[in-house]
Swiss-Prot record:
Residues 395-409 have a biased composition (Pro residues). Residues 388-492 are annotated as: Disordered. PANTHER family: ZINC FINGER CCHC DOMAIN-CONTAINING PROTEIN 8, ZINC FINGER, CCHC DOMAIN CONTAINING 8. Its main location: nucleus. InterPro entries: NEXT_complex_subunit_ZCCHC8 (IPR052115), PSP_pro-rich (IPR006568), Znf_CCHC (IPR001878). Keywords: Metal-binding, Nucleus, Phosphoprotein, Zinc, Zinc-finger. A zinc finger (CCHC-type) spans 183-200. This is Zinc finger CCHC domain-containing protein 8 homolog. GO terms for molecular function: RNA binding; zinc ion binding. It comes from Drosophila melanogaster. The keyword Cell wall biogenesis/degradation does not apply.
Length: 553
């Protein structure tokens, strides 16, 4: 029998060990399990073994020639019961032991053996007998509204190990890396020593450039520097982002279409909220000052800033002319005016900041001992007359006779007029004011009675001519009655003054300069001149901007 054949039997076997160095439990290629019956059979019948061996060799050669594989070894069983019970276990053990080698195991139930062949050619794949297969198991239906659809695909493989990808990664790392500021030598640029300890020859131009670069890099801590992602704006997509997302120039992103179903993003609505600080302001008379965008009685703690409402083209703002509204493809409704930015702001109600509004200043109440100026009295009379003219649209009264001239001033004992009479007192001015108000009331009552007595059918030209002189005479009589009869010495035109100075002329202006030094503005502040003009221009621009916002609202 060949040395590569292994015989297995459950009965007590005798083991023939070729090499003495093999440990217990270890199998070698030279170990052969032989039944005791086979030993006796070998001794008694050697010619039959040769015949069986030849027969087996011929059968093995036939199988190898047919399959094209070379035989490696065989496992033969003595009894059929042992073959049926141990066949699967032996096959699994052999396949696991020789999994890394190209070995195929075949069982032969007729000869009660398992053969191992080395694969020399690939086995042809078995062609399926059926042309097609019908799947009878139903699949879960997808919701097309929640699954985005893409019109473009990328067939290229994103290989992270390519040179371009490595270069882009390195650039991104370099951009994000922010090394700590280290002091370096202005002359050679080395960070290990300073300019004082530099051994290389001094280059003044290089030192000057390095110093300028160092000083320009320093910034004030309170200056609002530009953020890293400050250029990103919501609702606006840059060209690079559009190219990365695979959208063309006139194509709207999918998120803008989904907003038509989901509405305005709540996170950006929270961003537009402006909460009050809770600080109350009071004016001079003790009443609380309301803000420019609030009204009295409001108790809201927050409002919405209109300028922070984001515009999304295709959702709350009309898209550009070159954009195509592909709402049917995305299964969303078309653009609706009810979702526009203006209607959304209206839906917020009164909780909206409409910009700065200038309010009128509340006049403080005048003190009781304050003397009203004649200009104020005249202004109030003019306003009163204007109100009467606006209320009554009757024709004006005929011209009345001018009032009589005041009596000549009385002469003093010396026969000369005094240089100037004293001004009237406060009581006299109040009495004159009351008399003038009474005259106006009388004139208003006459006008109302005349309007009631007139009718478009009864009046004629003769009655008008008769009523005119009588009204003029009555007005003259009342004016003569109401004229003051208090005598006075002299009359001067102009604004009456209650008190006069005892000095006839003002002092010389040079006297005020004694002991006063000249003021030198911004003496200890270099490069600070011209700030007043800059502040004026800034306030002017702010004023114009506020007026523009008020006009827009």
């Amino acid at each position: 029998m060949d040395n590569s054949v292994i015989l297995i039997d459950d009965s007590q076997n005798s083991v023939v060990i070729v090499d003495d160095d093999v440990e217990d439990g270890e199998l070698e290629d030279d170990v052969v399990f032989v039944c005791p019956e086979e030993l006796t059979r070998k001794e008694i019948e050697p010619p039959t073994d040769k015949i069986e061996e030849k027969h087996s060799n011929t059968s093995i050669q036939d199988t190898t020639e047919e399959d094209g594989d070379s035989l490696v070894f065989e496992v033969r069983f003595n009894k059929e019961a042992h073959f049926t019970s141990l066949q699967q276990q032996v096959l699994v053990a052999l396949e696991g032991a020789f999994a890394d080698k190209q070995i195929v195991f075949r069982d032969n139930p007729q000869e009660l053996m398992i053969s191992a062949f080395e694969r020399s050619r690939t086995l042809p794949e078995e062609e399926p007998q059926d042309l097609f297969l019908i799947d009878t198991q139903p699949a879960a239906k997808l919701n097309a509204a929640n699954v985005p659809s893409y019109k473009r695909c990328n067939a290229d493989i994103l290989d992270e190990q390519t040179e371009e990808r490595k270069k882009l990664k390195a650039e991104a790392v370099n951009k994000c890396f922010r090394p700590k500021a280290q002091s370096s030598c202005f002359n050679c640029g080395d960070t290990e020593h300073s300019l004082r300890d530099c051994t290389k020859p001094r280059n003044n131009s290089r030192i000057t450039r390095a110093r300028k670069k160092m000083t320009s890099r320093t910034e004030r801590y309170h200056v609002d520097t530009e953020q890293r992602f400050g250029h990103i704006r919501p609702g606006k997509i840059s060209t690079k982002t559009r190219h990365a997302m695979g959208y063309s120039r006139g194509q709207l992103p999918f998120i803008f279409y989904r907003m038509r179903v989901l509405g305005y993003p709540p996170a950006w609505l929270e961003e537009a909220k402006v909460q009050s600080s809770g600080i109350a302001l009071f004016n001079a008379d003790g009443s609380e000052v309301t803000k420019s965008d609030e009204e009295e009685g409001e108790s809201e703690t927050f409002k919405y800033d209109v300028n922070k409402i984001v515009e999304y083209p295709g959702f709350n703002v009309q898209p550009k002319a070159n954009c195509f509204d592909d709402f049917k493809h995305h299964n969303v409704p078309p653009f609706q005016e009810s979702q526009s930015k203006e209607n959304f702001i209206k839906s917020l109600g009164e909780n909206v900041i409409n910009g700065y509004k200038r309010k009128k200043l509340v006049d403080l109440p005048a003190p009781h001992d304050r003397v009203p100026a004649p200009s104020e009295l005249l202004t109030s009379f003019d306003d009163y007359d204007m109100e009467l003219e606006e209320e009554t649209e009757d024709p004006p009264l005929p011209p009345s006779v001018p009032p009589p001239q005041p009596p000549p001033p009385e002469e003093c004992e010396d026969g000369e007029l005094t240089a100037r009479s004293p001004s009237p007192s406060l009581e006299d001015l109040k009495a004159q004011q009351e008399e003038l108000l009474q005259e106006l009331d009388v004139n208003a009552s006459h006008n109302t009675t005349a309007n009631e007595s007139k009718s478009p059918t009864d009046l004629d030209d003769t009655s008008e001519t008769e009523v005119g002189p009588s009204a003029a005479e009555s007005g003259n009589n009342e004016q003569s009655r109401s004229a003051p009869s208090t005598p006075f010495k002299a009359s001067y035109e102009g604004t009456p003054l209650l008190k006069f100075s005892v000095y006839d002329r003002l002092p010389v202006g040079s006297n005020f300069k004694v002991g006063v030094s000249d003021v030198i503005n911004f003496e200890n502040l270099p490069d600070s001149t011209g700030k007043y003009e800059q502040m004026k221009d800034l306030l002017k621009n702010v004023r114009e901007k506020m007026v523009k916002l008020q006009n827009e609202n």
